[in-house]
């Protein structure tokens, strides 16, 4: 199974605007071994072939979306990424979660299902002042890109 999931994960990883490092091919197996009850992976199949997956942590009152993988050749045709988002919402509701965390990427499409952004403040300071000057452009690069908030709800009625 991992030989099917890992390439789908890499499809998203290579498209990411910011990435620190790629996961190892055994990452999902190791997460399941470490967190057998709370770490969940669900796959999407078309004509018997796995075309996507999503992983998440199901904690006491919270569903925390983790990594996903998508076959981009089929994504436009079958709206796979959007389906994954709806399924995260469905799983959170069925689990009785009071909170669904979808992560910090792809904010615009997540807002189409009702996700609300929350500011995240991060302070980084090195002991060495020269290092602080070197770090500053990197920190500026981490700022989220501009996006247009959407809403699935009718506003102003």
Regions found by a protein language model. Give the residues of each.
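A conserved beta-strand-loop-helix scaffold within acyl/acetyltransferase catalytic domains
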Residues: 1-76, 157
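Short, flexible segments with low predicted structural confidence
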Residues: 3, 64, 81-82, 138
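Generic signal for short, ordered secondary-structure residues
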Residues: 7-10, 71, 88-89, 139, ...
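Short, hydrophobic/aromatic alpha-helical segments in well-folded domains
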Residues: 8, 24-31, 84-89, 105-109
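Active-site/acyl-donor-binding loops of N-acyltransferases
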Residues: 46, 95-157
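Conserved acetyl-CoA-binding loop-helix of GNAT-fold acetyltransferases
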Residues: 75-90, 102
